[in-house]
Amino acid sequence: GDLPVCGETCFGGTCNTPGCVCAWPVCTR
């Protein structure tokens, strides 16, 4: 299956997308 795409803006070090981590200011895998 396809993995979720990371890239949302993150605040407080948390990302809503599973498997993504906050690399301020955006989420990345």
From Swiss-Prot:
UniProt function note: Probably participates in a plant defense mechanism.
Record has Disulfide bond as a keyword: yes
Modifications made to the protein after synthesis: This is a cyclic peptide.
Alphabetical UniProt keywords: Disulfide bond, Knottin, Plant defense
Protein family: Belongs to the cyclotide family. Moebius subfamily.
Covalent link Cyclopeptide (Gly-Arg), residues: 1-29
Pfam families listed in its UniProt record: Cyclotide
Name the UniProt record assigns to this protein: Cyclotide psyleio C
Stored InterPro entries: Cyclotide, Cyclotide_moebius_CS, Cyclotide_sf
Comment text on domains: The presence of a 'disulfide through disulfide knot' structurally defines this protein as a knottin.
Keyword Transcription regulation: no
Intrachain disulfide bonds: 6-20, 10-22, 15-27
GO biological process: defense response
Annotated source species: Psychotria leiocarpa
